């Protein structure tokens, strides 16, 4: 599957169950008629599958009742690097709102990518996160995993990101529409973490962008053709109550057995600047010395290609962060994520970034 996979996996399981009823009791070693499979997997949103290239007429404009969009072939991308970029742009445009099938040939085989599955509802997310996950590494891992303790005590509040940054896979996996868990579900998870050995400190609370819990579109998202809810400016239809996010964090902090709650990364700084009260709380109450955020670069031409806000809001955020940290008697630091070698970023751009860091 592609995307988060729960709906696709459920659909696959139901179809396999139907096959079992059709063919009767079989040993796992007995072959099943191969003619069943091509039709069995057709039309499942959020999946990719391989078919024979010859099975798709060269002039076909539709498949499985949906419009067919052809991407540059694998061989074309190897021969002409620009084709890889063109294919990536087409893929991204179709992933968010598409009801079309994407096809990419590779010799005698073609990958078919179905339209994305719908995001899970709040009730479905709550049911998923209520499952008894062990929060331990898979037994196949023999060596220690450095991040495992941090991950084991973190809480996902929502999926999706309105940022739509052009380099980021999160919106491709989870979509730009925010799907949020209920406060009750999040607090139940906080209780379970608090009951764990050394579970008193919750390392991170949030999602792809930490301050988008509960966000929604006030307009009609089915008609939206924007690449980003945030760029070039925050869409007037993007609605989020950041103070509700702060109230949620305070309720998590008040959970019996919880000693510390942190938002360690992912605060969208241009959005945070829209609510000074919430930003002061993120900084003073829920930052544990360091906050990781993602300006990615400092050169306007590169930031435009990335669909990132300019340096003016980032520097305004830094000033506010220092001011609110000092007001709470804390010495804290912002750790910036920065990117090199982005398509369109030149050596001269990187020298400008180096000069900015050194200043």
Features from the language model and the residues they span:
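Glycine-rich beta-alpha loop elements in corrinoid/cobalamin-binding modules
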Residues: 1-106
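Conserved SAM/AdoMet-binding glycine-rich loop
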Residues: 192-335, 339-343
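N-terminal [4Fe-4S]-dependent radical SAM core
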Residues: 85-154
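Catalytic cores of alpha/beta
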Residues: 277-278, 342-358
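Conserved, mostly hydrophobic/aromatic
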Residues: 128, 161, 165, 186, ...
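Hydrophobic alpha-helical scaffolding
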Residues: 2, 114-118, 151-158, 172, ...
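Conserved alpha-helical substructure of the radical SAM core
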Residues: 172-201, 251
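N-terminal pre-triad scaffold of radical SAM enzymes
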Residues: 141-169, 194, 203
